[in-house]
C-alpha cells in the first residue's frame, strides 16, 4: 500500500475497481493493414517503434524492435482474434507524482482537498486523518461518460466516434 505521513496528517490508499478500460475491435482495411475505419473514413494508425531488451532465464539479453500502433482510442494490440484498441483514462493523465507530492506537503485538510483536485490517481480509495480530528474516506475514480446505447462491458465497435468516451464524471 501507499502511505504518506507528515507532522500534521496521514493518508493511505486501497485499490478500488472502477471500470476504467474500454476495448474496441478495429475494422482493418483489406489491403492497407495500417489503416482502420473510423466514421466512414480510412485512417492510418499512428506508428512508432520501440527498442526493447528481453532478458532470458540464462541471462542472455536479446534486443527486440517492436512496431507500436495508436488509434483514435489509444494503443493497439493484434492477436489471433483480431485487432483491438483500448482506452484507459490513466494514459491521459500523468500527474500522479505531483498529486502524491502535494498530498504529502499538505498541512491541513483544505490543502489535502486541493491536492485531490489534481485527479492523478483515479483508481485508488483514499483514507485520511489529521491532528485536528478530521477523518476522510473517498472512493476515487475518473468514470468515463459513455453513450448508454452500448454495452460497455463487452468489446465495442472501433469504427465510430459514437463509441469514444465523452469526458469523465
Give each language-model segment a name.
Residues 1-169:
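Mature extracytoplasmic enzyme cores
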